[in-house]
From Swiss-Prot:
The lineage of its organism: Bacteria, Pseudomonadati, Pseudomonadota, Gammaproteobacteria, Lysobacterales. It comes from Xanthomonas axonopodis pv. citri (strain 306). Catalyzes a salvage reaction resulting in the formation of AMP, that is energically less costly than de novo synthesis. Homodimer. InterPro entries: Ade_phspho_trans, PRibTrfase_dom, PRTase-like, UPRTase/APRTase. This is Adenine phosphoribosyltransferase.
Length: 186
């Protein structure tokens, strides 16, 4: 059971109250960090549906072949958004989690590097995709997903995140010619 003395948030529910379902967890995953926890939102069907509807709205008339969802919570939002938009879903995973041949993109962390990958045959060249993740923080992972899409010669029509942490300036790492839409910003 989580120690909710570190949690901030409300239990209000309703069509316009879904942002209140995102709670702050202080000092997680390490001291000094305030983590935006979306799990209360995910567990509330009506509020989750409202959040997904808002995320999907800007893309409803955009022709898409697939949503690329970034591990791990980008899987949850990306798969649900793909269903909402009636298109396919392609997972973007941490290294070693996908069978078969993959494309790999390395990206910088504060101390060191990490990688993400996707199947090299996931989509045909020129497929139109939307990149989805839960949170835009420093922008490294989202930028790496853009790099994977470029390796496969996909057409990235945009990116969608549920939450943007503006103070971390992740948007500055994004491609200026590709729309990046955050449903909620802090």
């Amino acid at each position: 059971m989580t120690d909710c003395s570190r949690c901030a948030g409300t239990n209000t529910s309703g069509p316009n109250h879904w942002p209140e379902r995102i709670r702050d967890i202080v000092d997680f995953p390490k001291p000094g960090i305030v983590f935006k926890d979306i799990t209360p939102l995910l567990s509330d069907g009506p509020d989750f549906a409202s959040a997904l509807d808002e995320m999907a709205q800007p893309w409803r008339t955009t022709p898409l072949d697939a949503v690329l969802g970034i591990e791990a919570r980008g899987f949850i939002l990306g798969a649900a958004l793909a269903r909402e938009l009636r298109t396919g879903f392609v997972p973007v995973r941490k290294p070693g989690k996908l069978p078969g041949r993959t494309l790999i993109q390395e990206y910088a962390l504060e101390y060191g590097t990490d990688r993400i990958e996707m199947h090299e045959d996931a989509l045909p060249r020129g497929a139109r995709v939307l990149i989805v993740d839960d949170v835009l923080a420093t922008g490294g992972t989202l930028r790496a997903a853009l790099g994977l899409a470029a390796q496969l010669e996909l057409e990235v029509v945009g990116a969608a995140v549920l939450v943007e942490l503006q103070g971390l300036q992740g948007r500055q790492k994004w491609a200026n010619d590709v729309p990046l839409l955050a449903t909620l910003s802090y």
